[in-house]
């Protein structure tokens, strides 16, 4: 019976905690500012800012401070919205700037979840900086003679001179590049089963989540932007394998199907991933 590729499994298994998750430094409290001029509203805004620090040393105190604020979350949101509109904010900016203001309980819940995620990053990598360094799989990809690190790869001299290309041309170049690199199969171990393929997808998703948490903790408002283009080229290759590698057993087919539906990857694939589903409902080896 066909089995998983152990070399692939070793490269794409999510590592276990190997470091202390203790914080080296405590994030400082933000400055209390006069924003709207209404003391209760400004106090509420400050407490929300403290909560969103995801700092365990401050969270319990911030939660206690919420109970002492007399203004309701809804009233604070309305007052802040009026302040933003009166100071030149457009409706979109106001809506974005007040997201979550009426639900401090959710902000606290998100903060506690963020604290857990940050602790997991530190426990796995030792530091946020280390989480952003290339993992072994990325180093292997970069060892390929086909590795591309040129964002203008495939552009004509005229396109480079113009400094832009349209969407259809961009898609054309993406397809050419993916055909050229072939998922970096020249250096990465080949998945032997659908379980291998899923494991690798899960690994890349996990790595993105880890780096998003790490960069947020480093103070980047929007977190981690995206993996290197080579990772997404690899994932497009893996999508093809989901369509072609036959499930070993019916149990594997069911597990992969469950993962595929929950992952929502089908919405980005041709015919909503119909080829993957057809492969999974077909014959198995056992």
Where are the model-predicted features located?
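Amphipathic alpha-helical coiled-coil segments with heptad-repeat character
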Residues: 59, 163, 187-197, 221, ...
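Non-transmembrane amphipathic alpha-helical segments
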Residues: 194-215, 238
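Extended, well-ordered alpha-helical segments in internal regulatory regions
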Residues: 208-219, 267-271
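Alpha-helical oligomerization segments
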Residues: 229-286
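Short, charge/polar-rich alpha-helical segments
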Residues: 167, 177-203
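Intrinsically disordered, low-structural-confidence terminal and linker regions
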Residues: 1-141
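Charged, low-complexity interaction regions
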Residues: 216-224, 247
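Low-complexity, serine/threonine/proline-enriched polar segments
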Residues: 119, 124-125, 129-172
């Amino acid at each position: 019976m066909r089995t998983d590729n152990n070399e692939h499994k070793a490269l794409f298994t999510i590592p276990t905690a190997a470091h202390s998750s203790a914080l080296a430094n405590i994030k400082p409290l933000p400055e209390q500012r006069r924003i709207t001029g209404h003391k209760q509203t400004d106090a509420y805004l400050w407490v929300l800012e403290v909560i969103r620090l995801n700092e365990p040393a401050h969270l319990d105190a911030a939660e206690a401070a919420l109970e002492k604020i007399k203004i309701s979350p809804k009233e604070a949101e309305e007052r802040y919205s009026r302040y933003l509109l009166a100071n030149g904010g457009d409706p979109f900016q106001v809506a974005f700037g007040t997201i979550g203001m009426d639900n401090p309980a959710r902000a606290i819940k998100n903060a506690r979840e963020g604290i857990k995620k940050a602790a997991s990053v530190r426990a796995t990598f030792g530091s946020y900086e280390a989480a952003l360094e290339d993992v072994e799989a990325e180093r292997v990809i970069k060892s390929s003679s086909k590795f591309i690190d040129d964002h203008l790869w495939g552009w004509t001299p005229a396109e480079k001179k113009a400094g832009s290309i349209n969407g259809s041309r961009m898609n054309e170049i993406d397809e050419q590049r993916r055909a050229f690199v072939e998922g970096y199969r020249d250096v990465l171990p080949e998945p032997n089963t659908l379980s291998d393929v899923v494991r690798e997808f899960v690994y890349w998703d996990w790595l993105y989540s880890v780096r998003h948490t790490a960069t947020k903790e480093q103070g980047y408002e929007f977190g981690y932007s995206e993996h290197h283009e080579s990772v997404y080229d690899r994932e497009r290759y893996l999508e093809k394998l989901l369509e072609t590698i036959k499930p070993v057993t019916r149990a594997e087919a069911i597990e992969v199907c469950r993962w595929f539906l929950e992952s929502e990857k089908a919405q980005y694939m041709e015919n909503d991933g119909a080829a993957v589903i057809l492969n999974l409902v077909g014959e198995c080896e056992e």
